Amino acid sequence: MRFLLPERSLYMNITPKQMLLYAVSDRAWSNSDEEFLSQAKQAIKSGVTIFQLREKHTEYEHFREIALKLKPICKQYNVPLIINDNVKLAKEIDADGVHLGQDDLDIKAAREYLGADKIIGVSAHNVKEALEAENGGADYLGSGAAFVTSTKTD
């Protein structure tokens, strides 16, 4: 992750300290919602400083249900909850922010929909995408998976 330039005042919604250990969920490691929530809580208690709920293969209502159960866990430990890709869900549950891919809603529209105080992160796969995200007002950039994951086959 790279933080945007302070002189641009773009990372006012998130601090470098909050980005020390960014967890991205992978439900393939859990057999049930209860097990997933227990694992998420353990990760947060072990030092995760921001948590992205990434549910690529889950129906909206189930995604919402999991997010609503995870939100108080994150709040208890003062860990921002980021919803992957789904701006509507992020607003509906009042999550701390959203992480957008290159094919998702653009940053400006997401910011208008969610509000100026929400965290917006963007995946960038090259310098051009990174600069576009920075100029578009992203609070942080995700630079891709470092390890093989069942949720990111490309």
Language-model segments: which ranges?
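Conserved N-terminal beta1-alpha1 strand-loop-helix module at the mouth
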Residues: 6-105, 112-139
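A short acidic, helix-capping loop that chelates divalent metal ions and anchors anionic groups
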Residues: 53, 90, 147-153
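Glycine-rich phosphate-binding active-site loops on the catalytic face of alpha/beta enzymes
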Residues: 102-109, 142-152
